[in-house]
C-alpha cells in the first residue's frame, strides 16, 4: 500500500458542523472535534465527501479514476455499492492562528498535538520524525509559525481551541428579522494534517460504450487499471477544495498540500 501525508490549509473561515451535539448556551452550530481530546478536526467522512464533490464537479478526473478512489453508492441506476480504493483519515488540527501585536496573527500548536500526529503516521508505516514535521509546518506557515515561540503549553493551546476563544459568528436573516443562529468557525490560516492510504493501482469495471447495444439492452464492460498516486496527486495537490458548510458565502475553501508520499 502507498501512503501520503497532506496538509489542509484553510484559506477562508471554516465551519464543518458537528451534527451529533445539541446546542447549549450561545452556540447553535458547533464545529467537529476529536472525540477524545476535544481539539477541532475534520472527520474523515466529511473530508471524503468534500474531496469527492470536488473531484466530481471541479476536477478534470475521469469517471473510472473517481470510482477507483471514492467508490460509488447504490442509486441512480447503480445496482450495488462499489468500494473505493482510498482510505481517508480524520484531518487533525496542527496549527491554529491567534492574534498577534506584531504580525496581525501567528500560528500556534503544542507538542502533544504534534506527537500524536507523528505517532499515527508511525503506526501506519510512515517514518516522519517530529523535527521534519515542525520544519514542514514552518514552511506551510509562511512566516507566521515560529518553531521557537509557536509551540506553546498544551493547556494554553486547549484554551485557544475552546468554545470561549474560537470565533462565533451570527448568521442574520436576509429579510432583516434578526439573527437566525450563532455558529462556531475555525479562522482562516488554520492548518490540518491528514493521511491517505491506497494501493499502487486499482482495477475498475465500467461500461464499454463502444461495444454496448442500447437497442437490445446488451451492455458490455471493460476493466481499467488506475494509477492511484497519479490520479490523487493530479486532482488534489496544490488545489483549493471547499469543505463544510456555507460555500455560497465563502466558507471552507482550503488548499491541499502533499507533504510526503511513501
Features from the language model and the residues they span:
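RNA-binding basic/glycine-rich loop and surface signature characteristic of RAMP-family CRISPR effectors
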Residues: 1-262
Amino acid at each position: 500500500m502507498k501512503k501520503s501525508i497532506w496538509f489542509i490549509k484553510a484559506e477562508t473561515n471554516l465551519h464543518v458542523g458537528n451534527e451529533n451535539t445539541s446546542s447549549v448556551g450561545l452556540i447553535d452550530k458547533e464545529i467537529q472535534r476529536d472525540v477524545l481530546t476535544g481539539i477541532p478536526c475534520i472527520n474523515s467522512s466529511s473530508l471524503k465527501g468534500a474531496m469527492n464533490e470536488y473531484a466530481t464537479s471541479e476536477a478534470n478526473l475521469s469517471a473510472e479514476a473517481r470510482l477507483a478512489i471514492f467508490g460509488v453508492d447504490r442509486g441512480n441506476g447503480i445496482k450495488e455499492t462499489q468500494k473505493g480504493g482510498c482510505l481517508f483519515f480524520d484531518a487533525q488540527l496542527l496549527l491554529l492562528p491567534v492574534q498577534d501585536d506584531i504580525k496581525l496573527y501567528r500560528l500556534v500548536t503544542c507538542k502533544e498535538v504534534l506527537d500524536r500526529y507523528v505517532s499515527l503516521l508511525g503506526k501506519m508505516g510512515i517514518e516522519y520524525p517530529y523535527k521534519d514535521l515542525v520544519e514542514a509546518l514552518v514552511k506551510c506557515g509562511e512566516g507566521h509559525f515560529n518553531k521557537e515561540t509557536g509551540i506553546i503549553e498544551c493547556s494554553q493551546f486547549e484554551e485557544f481551541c475552546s468554545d470561549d476563544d474560537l470565533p462565533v459568528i451570527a448568521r442574520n436573516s436576509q429579510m432583516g428579522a434578526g439573527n437566525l443562529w450563532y455558529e462556531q468557525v475555525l479562522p482562516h490560516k488554520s492548518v490540518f494534517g491528514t493521511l491517505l492510504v491506497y494501493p499502487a493501482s486499482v482495477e475498475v469495471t465500467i461500461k464499454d460504450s463502444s461495444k454496448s447495444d442500447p437497442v437490445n439492452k446488451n451492455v458490455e464492460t471493460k476493466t481499467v487499471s488506475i494509477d492511484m498516486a497519479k490520479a490523487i496527486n493530479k486532482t488534489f495537490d496544490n488545489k483549493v477544495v471547499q469543505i463544510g458548510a456555507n460555500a455560497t458565502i465563502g466558507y471552507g475553501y482550503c488548499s491541499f498540500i502533499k507533504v510526503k508520499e511513501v
